[in-house]
From Swiss-Prot:
Residues 544-556 have a biased composition (Low complexity). It is a multi-pass membrane protein. It comes from Dictyostelium discoideum (Social amoeba). This is Frizzled and smoothened-like protein Q. Glycans are attached at N46, N64, N99, N104, N144, N155, N181, N233, N289. Residues 255-261, 327-341, 410-422, 512-578 are cytoplasmic.
Length: 578
């Protein structure tokens, strides 16, 4: 992460330097000028007059050099002072004046630049080697001007003038620099922080812009829009949390007997509820991703970050792993069969859930990042996210697809044999729920790869922002990172995870039947003295009558209930005969 930030960001800066240097081709016929006190090189040069090329402006020259020197804050303490020396000697070359007499006794003045000595360039070559080799080869110590003259002569430069007469001048190279130790200090422009002052040895999750400058925390990728995303996320997650609580009550607390289908729905809802809980914990604290150390994002050593990371991973994997079981139950029901060895499935699923939650913790991978909350960090390119989340998600997606296709085939055959719109409506509703599962998993697992594919674009946006803050007022610089729409859609997709199961099973008439038949609910009503107001017996009878044709929705995994469904189908077929 550190090196990728460094290389991608410095490309823009050093392309800027290349453009500046290339524009400074050797042009003769210029003038000798005093070095302006506003020049950033005023205190670094041991002479007062410099050679100004024809057509150049002192004001513009000062601005260009100032911008470049500010960009050198993003190098290293070893490279910066030597690079500044080269820039100053090259941008403000010492002016040598020669007064010659022509054959007609006319005096002519030659103003010539004294170019930086090769020895000065060599002092910068080693500490700035990574930058020179990758980005500014034209500025190597062996570079030449377009007319063939060495840019950094070893001893001197020969100038020849034939138009005004046969004049040859040998001008010694210039090494009149005032060495200043203060120039080796890196001053990171706000809001960046100096790594030397803020990075704590032994602690991680710092985001380097260069070897010397790190991002401050918090850092908004989408300035001005983060609060909108947070509010949307909180609202959708709250709705999902409420529906999950309702599903837990309906299929886990109130039933007199919990069937296999109920347990699958209950487990999925518990996962959605736990996932929402991790968001609620983080939303209670402003800038939750930031540690108490300036510039450091929270890592696993911050126990609250570890806790929320574990909770989110456990909840998400729970919902993901139990969604294929819901699809499998739907398939088995469509075959009028029964799930066998459900207890074994239960043990295997929960074992994998606990292992995949704990495994990243043993690897120390739970931490916050610039773009995400506390979860599994893959900034170092490791495979922890793949092993613990994405590969299991892909397996779940494959199983959901398989069982959905098989279920559609079976339901179609069933409807052709015994047309029943109410049963068909229920089956279509479950299929829509499974499609929502697939959409959520597909989008959540593919967004990572889209973001990684666009990573260079993100780095370029950050590079432009850093270049802006390096040149002027940080308040005038705004980061324009791409992908806001996809980020917002991802929040919506993750936020409705728990709500999807409610669409398929929470709106079914069997829910009323479960509540009205529940002995626990009856006990609560009796304790609250509401049993005389709410007539359960009549409600139960009405519910039974309304659900007579859809009795298959209650379990599909019990032999007795399968028999009821078959009887109802036969009864429906008889009633529909003329």
């Amino acid at each position: 992460m550190k090196n990728s930030f460094l290389i991608n960001i410095l490309i823009i800066y050093y392309l800027f330097i290349i453009l500046f240097v290339n524009s400074q081709d050797l042009k003769l016929g210029g003038s000798c000028e005093l070095i302006d006190s506003n020049s950033p090189c005023f205190s670094k040069l041991n002479y007062t007059n410099f050679y100004l090329q024809p057509g150049d402006s002192i004001t513009q020259l000062n601005k260009n050099v100032s911008d470049i020197i500010r960009m050198l804050e993003f190098t290293t303490p070893e490279c910066k002072p030597n690079a500044i020396n080269i820039m100053c000697l090259k941008s403000y070359p010492k002016c040598e004046t020669y007064n010659e007499t022509l054959s007609n006794n006319t005096n002519i003045i030659f103003n010539l630049p004294s170019l930086p000595c090769n020895s000065i360039c060599l002092k910068a070559e080693t500490p700035c080697k990574i930058f020179i080799d990758n980005f500014i080869k034209d500025l190597s110590c062996n570079s030449n001007f377009s007319n063939g003259a060495p840019m950094f002569p070893i001893n001197s430069t020969d100038y020849e003038f034939k138009e005004s007469g046969n004049f040859n001048f040998n001008v010694e190279c210039n090494d009149n620099i005032i060495y200043d130790n203060s120039s080796s200090v890196i001053n990171c422009p706000a809001p960046l922080l100096n790594s030397k002052d803020h990075v704590i040895p032994g602690k991680t999750t710092y985001y380097y812009i260069t070897d010397s400058c790190i991002l401050d925390c918090p850092f908004e990728i989408y300035p001005g829009k983060t609060k909108i995303l947070d509010r949307t996320n909180y609202t959708l997650t709250s709705i999902s949390f409420i529906t999950c609580i309702f599903m837990i009550l309906t299929f886990g607390v109130l039933p007199n007997k919990i069937t296999h289908r109920m347990e699958s729905i209950l487990s999925f809802a518990c996962g959605g509820c736990i996932t929402a809980l991790s968001l609620f914990i983080q939303s209670r604290q402003d800038n939750f991703n930031c540690s108490s150390d300036p510039g450091r994002f929270k890592s696993q050593s911050d126990y609250l970050c570890l806790l929320t990371g574990l909770i989110f991973q456990f909840g998400a994997i729970t919902s993901i792993f139990w969604s294929p079981m819901i699809a499998y139950d739907f398939y088995i029901t469509s075959t009028l069969g029964k799930i066998r060895k459900f207890g074994l499935y239960r043990i295997v699923l929960w074992s994998f859930i606990f292992v995949l939650t704990a495994l990243p913790a043993f690897g120390g991978k739970y931490s916050a990042t610039v773009a995400t909350n506390c979860w599994i960090n893959s900034d170092d390119g490791s495979a922890w996210q793949y092993v613990s989340f994405y590969i299991p998600s892909w397996c779940a997606m494959g199983l959901i697809c398989l069982f959905s296709i098989l279920s559609v085939i079976n339901v179609s055959k069933m409807y052709i044999q015994t047309p029943n719109n109410r049963i068909l409506f229920f089956n279509i509703k479950i299929l829509i729920t499974l499609l929502l599962f697939l959409f959520v998993l597909t989008f959540a697992s593919s967004l990572k790869f889209y973001m990684e594919e666009r990573m260079d674009t993100y780095f370029d946006a950050i590079a432009v922002w850093v270049e802006c803050i390096g040149k002027g007022d940080p308040s005038q610089c705004e980061l324009h990172a791409p992908g806001y729409d996809l980020k917002a859609l991802n929040i919506v997709v993750i936020g409705i995870l728990g709500f999807t199961v409610f669409i398929g099973y929470g709106l079914d008439p069997i829910v009323i039947h479960i509540w009205m038949e529940s002995k626990k609910f009856q006990w609560v009503l009796k304790k609250c003295r509401l049993d005389k107001i709410i007539k359960l017996n009549n409600s139960i009878n009405n519910s039974n009558n309304n659900n007579n044709e859809t009795a298959s929705t209650s379990s599909g995994n019990e032999r007795k209930q399968t028999t009821v469904k078959m009887s109802n189908l036969k009864s429906t077929e008889i009633n529909q005969q003329p």
